[in-house]
Protein backbone atom coordinates (compact mmCIF):
# COMPACT_ATOMS: atom_id res chain seq x y z
CA UNK A 1 0.00 0.00 0.00
CA UNK A 2 1.35 3.41 -0.94
CA UNK A 3 2.54 5.43 2.04
CA UNK A 4 0.49 8.60 2.35
CA UNK A 5 1.55 11.75 4.14
CA UNK A 6 0.15 11.94 7.65
CA UNK A 7 -0.10 14.45 10.47
CA UNK A 8 0.11 13.54 14.14
CA UNK A 9 -1.30 16.71 15.66
CA UNK A 10 -4.60 18.35 14.67
CA UNK A 11 -5.08 21.56 12.73
CA UNK A 12 -7.59 23.98 14.21
CA UNK A 13 -9.25 27.04 12.72
CA UNK A 14 -10.34 29.75 15.14
CA UNK A 15 -12.55 32.09 13.18
CA UNK A 16 -15.17 34.76 13.67
CA UNK A 17 -15.94 38.39 12.98
CA UNK A 18 -13.03 40.81 13.53
CA UNK A 19 -13.02 41.82 17.20
CA UNK A 20 -14.41 38.55 18.55
CA UNK A 21 -11.14 37.47 20.17
CA UNK A 22 -9.57 35.14 17.60
CA UNK A 23 -5.98 36.21 18.18
CA UNK A 24 -6.31 36.21 21.98
CA UNK A 25 -7.84 32.72 21.92
CA UNK A 26 -5.25 31.40 19.46
CA UNK A 27 -2.27 32.80 21.32
CA UNK A 28 -3.50 31.52 24.68
CA UNK A 29 -4.37 28.11 23.24
CA UNK A 30 -0.97 27.59 21.60
CA UNK A 31 0.82 28.70 24.75
CA UNK A 32 -1.20 26.31 26.91
CA UNK A 33 -0.79 23.38 24.53
CA UNK A 34 2.97 23.82 24.24
CA UNK A 35 3.31 24.09 28.01
CA UNK A 36 1.23 20.99 28.75
CA UNK A 37 2.07 18.74 25.79
CA UNK A 38 5.54 20.02 24.97
CA UNK A 39 7.09 19.16 28.33
CA UNK A 40 7.36 15.44 27.69
CA UNK A 41 7.07 15.27 23.90
CA UNK A 42 8.35 16.96 20.76
CA UNK A 43 4.87 18.30 20.01
CA UNK A 44 4.88 21.98 19.13
CA UNK A 45 1.82 23.94 18.08
CA UNK A 46 2.02 27.11 15.99
CA UNK A 47 -0.23 30.18 15.90
CA UNK A 48 -0.75 31.41 12.34
CA UNK A 49 -2.26 34.89 12.32
CA UNK A 50 -3.20 34.89 8.65
CA UNK A 51 -3.32 38.67 8.35
CA UNK A 52 0.36 38.75 9.33
CA UNK A 53 1.31 35.58 7.42
CA UNK A 54 -0.20 36.97 4.21
CA UNK A 55 2.04 40.02 4.44
CA UNK A 56 5.15 38.03 5.40
CA UNK A 57 4.68 35.62 2.49
CA UNK A 58 3.79 38.28 -0.07
CA UNK A 59 0.19 37.13 -0.52
CA UNK A 60 -1.44 40.58 -0.55
CA UNK A 61 -3.22 41.11 -3.86
CA UNK A 62 -4.58 44.64 -3.50
CA UNK A 63 -5.96 47.20 -1.09
CA UNK A 64 -9.58 48.27 -0.51
CA UNK A 65 -9.47 51.94 0.45
CA UNK A 66 -13.17 52.14 1.38
CA UNK A 67 -12.91 49.34 3.91
CA UNK A 68 -9.32 50.16 4.81
CA UNK A 69 -8.27 46.54 4.38
CA UNK A 70 -5.85 44.42 2.37
CA UNK A 71 -7.17 41.90 -0.16
CA UNK A 72 -5.44 38.53 0.09
CA UNK A 73 -4.52 36.34 -2.88
CA UNK A 74 -6.17 33.23 -1.45
CA UNK A 75 -4.71 30.78 -3.98
CA UNK A 76 -1.18 31.96 -3.31
CA UNK A 77 -1.81 31.94 0.43
CA UNK A 78 -3.12 28.38 0.40
CA UNK A 79 -0.18 27.17 -1.69
CA UNK A 80 2.11 28.71 0.90
CA UNK A 81 0.26 27.27 3.91
CA UNK A 82 -0.43 23.75 2.67
CA UNK A 83 3.00 22.31 3.61
CA UNK A 84 2.58 23.70 7.14
CA UNK A 85 -0.92 22.26 7.47
CA UNK A 86 0.26 18.85 6.29
CA UNK A 87 2.69 18.76 9.22
CA UNK A 88 -0.17 19.44 11.66
CA UNK A 89 -0.20 21.42 14.87
CA UNK A 90 -1.38 24.68 13.27
CA UNK A 91 -3.90 27.00 14.92
CA UNK A 92 -5.24 29.16 12.09
CA UNK A 93 -6.45 32.60 13.19
CA UNK A 94 -8.51 34.36 10.53
CA UNK A 95 -11.96 35.76 9.81
CA UNK A 96 -12.22 33.56 6.70
CA UNK A 97 -12.24 29.77 6.90
CA UNK A 98 -13.63 28.37 3.66
CA UNK A 99 -10.37 28.39 1.65
CA UNK A 100 -8.73 25.65 3.71
CA UNK A 101 -9.22 22.06 2.44
CA UNK A 102 -11.45 19.95 4.65
CA UNK A 103 -8.92 17.10 4.50
CA UNK A 104 -6.41 19.26 6.42
CA UNK A 105 -8.73 20.64 9.12
CA UNK A 106 -9.79 18.79 12.26
CA UNK A 107 -11.74 21.40 14.21
CA UNK A 108 -13.35 24.74 13.34
CA UNK A 109 -14.14 27.05 16.25
CA UNK A 110 -16.47 29.96 15.45
CA UNK A 111 -16.34 32.65 18.13
CA UNK A 112 -19.48 34.71 18.71
CA UNK A 113 -19.69 38.07 20.45
CA UNK A 114 -22.53 40.28 21.60
CA UNK A 115 -22.94 43.21 19.23
CA UNK A 116 -22.52 45.84 21.93
CA UNK A 117 -19.17 44.31 22.91
CA UNK A 118 -18.18 43.98 19.28
CA UNK A 119 -19.03 47.63 18.59
CA UNK A 120 -16.83 48.79 21.45
CA UNK A 121 -13.93 46.58 20.39
CA UNK A 122 -14.03 47.73 16.79
CA UNK A 123 -14.31 51.36 17.82
CA UNK A 124 -11.07 51.04 19.80
CA UNK A 125 -9.44 49.80 16.58
CA UNK A 126 -10.53 53.00 14.84
CA UNK A 127 -12.57 51.18 12.20
CA UNK A 128 -14.29 53.62 9.86
CA UNK A 129 -18.10 53.68 9.87
CA UNK A 130 -18.48 51.55 6.74
CA UNK A 131 -16.06 48.88 7.93
CA UNK A 132 -17.57 48.86 11.42
CA UNK A 133 -21.14 48.46 10.16
CA UNK A 134 -20.17 45.73 7.71
CA UNK A 135 -18.64 43.68 10.50
CA UNK A 136 -21.60 44.22 12.81
CA UNK A 137 -23.94 43.08 10.03
CA UNK A 138 -21.73 40.06 9.45
CA UNK A 139 -22.08 39.06 13.10
CA UNK A 140 -25.83 39.66 13.20
CA UNK A 141 -26.40 37.58 10.06
CA UNK A 142 -24.12 34.77 11.30
CA UNK A 143 -22.22 34.94 8.02
CA UNK A 144 -19.02 33.29 9.26
CA UNK A 145 -20.85 30.58 11.19
CA UNK A 146 -22.82 29.64 8.09
CA UNK A 147 -19.66 29.77 5.97
CA UNK A 148 -18.02 27.28 8.32
CA UNK A 149 -21.01 24.94 8.27
CA UNK A 150 -21.14 25.09 4.47
CA UNK A 151 -17.42 24.38 4.10
CA UNK A 152 -16.85 21.55 6.57
CA UNK A 153 -18.57 18.54 8.05
CA UNK A 154 -21.03 20.17 10.47
CA UNK A 155 -19.88 17.89 13.29
CA UNK A 156 -16.39 19.46 13.41
CA UNK A 157 -17.77 23.01 13.58
CA UNK A 158 -18.46 24.40 17.05
CA UNK A 159 -19.76 27.78 18.18
CA UNK A 160 -18.38 29.35 21.38
CA UNK A 161 -19.23 32.59 23.16
CA UNK A 162 -16.46 35.17 23.50
CA UNK A 163 -17.76 38.09 25.54
CA UNK A 164 -15.59 37.91 28.66
CA UNK A 165 -12.08 36.92 29.73
CA UNK A 166 -13.61 34.10 31.77
CA UNK A 167 -15.31 32.69 28.68
CA UNK A 168 -12.03 32.81 26.78
CA UNK A 169 -10.25 30.86 29.53
CA UNK A 170 -13.03 28.26 29.54
CA UNK A 171 -12.91 27.97 25.75
CA UNK A 172 -9.14 27.50 25.72
CA UNK A 173 -9.37 24.79 28.40
CA UNK A 174 -12.06 22.94 26.45
CA UNK A 175 -10.17 23.08 23.17
CA UNK A 176 -6.96 21.97 24.91
CA UNK A 177 -8.75 18.94 26.35
CA UNK A 178 -10.09 18.11 22.90
CA UNK A 179 -6.57 18.29 21.43
CA UNK A 180 -5.16 15.97 24.10
CA UNK A 181 -7.92 13.44 23.41
CA UNK A 182 -7.37 13.72 19.66
CA UNK A 183 -3.66 12.95 20.01
CA UNK A 184 -4.33 10.00 22.32
CA UNK A 185 -6.88 8.56 19.89
CA UNK A 186 -4.67 8.99 16.80
CA UNK A 187 -1.29 7.44 17.70
CA UNK A 188 -0.77 6.62 14.02
CA UNK A 189 -1.84 10.08 12.87
CA UNK A 190 -4.40 10.84 10.17
CA UNK A 191 -4.06 10.99 6.41
CA UNK A 192 -3.55 14.29 4.62
CA UNK A 193 -5.10 12.86 1.46
CA UNK A 194 -8.62 12.27 0.22
CA UNK A 195 -9.64 8.92 -1.23
CA UNK A 196 -8.64 8.64 -4.87
CA UNK A 197 -11.09 6.85 -7.12
CA UNK A 198 -9.86 4.87 -10.11
CA UNK A 199 -10.77 6.53 -13.39
CA UNK A 200 -10.54 4.20 -16.41
CA UNK A 201 -10.24 7.21 -18.71
CA UNK A 202 -6.87 7.98 -17.13
CA UNK A 203 -5.35 4.65 -18.20
CA UNK A 204 -3.99 3.96 -21.67
CA UNK A 205 -4.19 0.72 -23.66
CA UNK A 206 -0.67 -0.63 -23.92
CA UNK A 207 -1.54 -3.90 -25.66
CA UNK A 208 -2.98 -7.31 -24.85
CA UNK A 209 0.32 -8.57 -23.43
CA UNK A 210 -0.18 -6.43 -20.33
CA UNK A 211 -3.86 -7.25 -19.77
CA UNK A 212 -3.31 -9.79 -16.97
CA UNK A 213 -0.87 -7.49 -15.21
CA UNK A 214 -3.22 -4.53 -15.56
CA UNK A 215 -6.12 -6.54 -14.12
CA UNK A 216 -4.01 -7.58 -11.14
CA UNK A 217 -2.93 -3.99 -10.52
CA UNK A 218 -6.53 -2.81 -10.68
CA UNK A 219 -7.55 -5.40 -8.10
CA UNK A 220 -4.75 -4.17 -5.84
CA UNK A 221 -5.85 -0.57 -6.39
CA UNK A 222 -9.44 -1.43 -5.47
CA UNK A 223 -8.28 -3.14 -2.29
CA UNK A 224 -6.12 -0.14 -1.35
CA UNK A 225 -8.97 2.27 -2.06
CA UNK A 226 -11.33 0.23 0.13
CA UNK A 227 -8.80 0.22 2.97
CA UNK A 228 -8.33 3.99 2.62
CA UNK A 229 -12.10 4.55 2.62
CA UNK A 230 -12.48 2.48 5.80
CA UNK A 231 -9.61 4.38 7.42
CA UNK A 232 -11.08 7.75 6.41
CA UNK A 233 -14.55 6.79 7.69
CA UNK A 234 -13.09 5.62 11.00
CA UNK A 235 -11.14 8.87 11.44
CA UNK A 236 -14.20 10.95 10.54
CA UNK A 237 -16.38 9.11 13.08
CA UNK A 238 -13.78 9.70 15.78
CA UNK A 239 -13.64 13.42 14.91
CA UNK A 240 -17.42 13.64 15.21
CA UNK A 241 -17.39 12.00 18.67
CA UNK A 242 -14.63 14.29 19.94
CA UNK A 243 -16.32 17.43 18.65
CA UNK A 244 -19.58 16.50 20.35
CA UNK A 245 -17.66 16.37 23.64
CA UNK A 246 -16.15 19.85 23.27
CA UNK A 247 -19.42 21.45 22.20
CA UNK A 248 -21.24 20.24 25.31
From Swiss-Prot:
GO biological process: cellular response to oxidative stress; maturation of SSU-rRNA from tricistronic rRNA transcript (SSU-rRNA, 5.8S rRNA, LSU-rRNA); phenotypic switching; regulation of gene expression
Compartments, record wording: Cytoplasm; Nucleus
Protein purpose: Broad-specificity nucleoside monophosphate (NMP) kinase that catalyzes the reversible transfer of the terminal phosphate group between nucleoside triphosphates and monophosphates. Also has ATPase activity. Involved in the late cytoplasmic maturation steps of the 40S ribosomal particles, specifically 18S rRNA maturation. While NMP activity is not required for ribosome maturation, ATPase activity is. Associates transiently with small ribosomal subunit protein uS11. ATP hydrolysis breaks the interaction with uS11.
The keyword Kinase belongs to this UniProt entry's keyword annotation: yes
Binding, ATP: 19, 21-24, 125
GO cellular component: cytoplasm; nucleus
Phylogenetic placement of the source organism: Eukaryota, Fungi, Dikarya, Ascomycota, Saccharomycotina
Entry's Gene Ontology molecular function annotations: adenylate kinase activity; ATP binding; ATP hydrolysis activity
Similarity comment text for this entry: Belongs to the adenylate kinase family. AK6 subfamily.
Record region (NMPbind): 49-72
Bias-annotated ranges (Basic and acidic residues): 239-248
Catalytic activity field: AMP + ATP = 2 ADP; ATP + H2O = ADP + phosphate + H(+)
Spans annotated as LID: 124-134
Name of the encoding gene: HBR1
Protein name: Adenylate kinase isoenzyme 6 homolog HBR1
Amino acid sequence: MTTMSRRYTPNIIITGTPGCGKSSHSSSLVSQLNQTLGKETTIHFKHFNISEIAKERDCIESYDAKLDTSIVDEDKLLDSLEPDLEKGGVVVDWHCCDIFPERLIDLVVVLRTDNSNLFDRLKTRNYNDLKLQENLDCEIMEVILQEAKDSYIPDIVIELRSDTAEEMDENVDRISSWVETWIEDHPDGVSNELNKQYNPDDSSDEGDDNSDSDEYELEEDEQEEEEEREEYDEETNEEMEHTEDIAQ
